[in-house]
Amino acid sequence: MKRKDFLSTLLPLGAVLAASASTKNVVIESSKIPPYLKKGDTIGISSPAGYITLQEIEPAILKLKEWGFNIKIGTTIGKRDFTFGGTDAERLADFQQMLDDEKVSCILCARGGYGFIRIIDSLNFKKFTKKPKWIIGFSDITVLHSHLNANFGIASIHSKMCNSFPDDWAKADDVQKESIESIKKCLVGEKMKYTITPNAKNKTGIAYGELVGGNLKTIESLSGSKSDIDTTGKILFVEDTGEYLYSLDRMFWNLKRSGKLNKLSALLIGGFKIKKDDVGEEFGKSIEEIVLEKVAAYNYPVCFDFAVGHQKNNFALKCGVQHKLSVHLNECMLIEVK
């Protein structure tokens, strides 16, 4: 996983965002859902992983204010300790303050990179669990999504971060704008619906379950730790960037061997920016072949080319929230059901 949030479209994803229709006669249990935001609420911006400057997050600040939210800038913005947004102690203190501040209704991570795993075990979630708030991010922030789900059953939002907001909104691609706008839709409580162009390699079917997942390499790195997620009965989504095909094959084998694939409700495969094989060391399998080999014995639906990852079409997903996935030959759809 690279530190940079790549903005190039990696796979032909063709996702469309809209408010979903209600789904009836579905008995489900949900994670704890933080309160949705309203105009005038405060969003705190912190950088618990890689470093970023105030100038780099200004486009995000402008858009969030345009949506009607107030902004609190964390002390890590503008700080740098090598690749990190400040020392471990500084990043820990900033994020802890955001967690505990009752005036902050939501925490938006400024960027990913690497570093959350260095502070996750030192964070105190006591106040947060009593009064949860939405936490937003992806890539390295998968550490937090997984930790919240595994330990507290609290929902969070997997989406673009501050470093992905376009400098000039008027010149941004429509899909980039839609991806950013999906964050607002999640925050204000819209039920999300995504329609995905089918991939011929998909495994068809209909599934219900809690949505969990994130960056594949990060998920793999959490195996056996207190942040490791239980995927039983859940819809798992994964994405990654900057990896060789053989490395991805190893990661998916690890998921299979550790029991994360055998009891899924469904599997979503997002964008994968793949390193070119070294000459003479070609792996010989596509990402679809790698995945299908590992899930051949299972009957749940598998959807490729989902609009999540290090790319322009990286739509906001509510982790820990119940969804319905329908994978058909002519259409694939993910709908939030509660």
Q: In which residue ranges do the predicted regions lie?
A:
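N-terminal export signals
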Residues: R3-N25
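Short, acidic/small-residue loops that bind anionic groups at enzyme active sites
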Residues: F125-H147, A155-M161
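Oxyanion-binding "anion nests"
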Residues: L211-D249
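N-terminal small/polar loop signature for handling phosphorylated ligands or for N-terminal nucleophile
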Residues: T75-K131
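Short beta-strand elements in bilobed, periplasmic/extracellular small-molecule ligand-binding domains
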Residues: N70-D81, I235-F237
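C-terminal active-site/capping subdomain that shapes the small-molecule cofactor and substrate pocket
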Residues: W253-K338
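Conserved anion/nucleotide-ligand pocket segment
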Residues: I157-K217
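C-terminal segment of N-terminal export signals and the immediately downstream linker at the start
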Residues: S20-I52
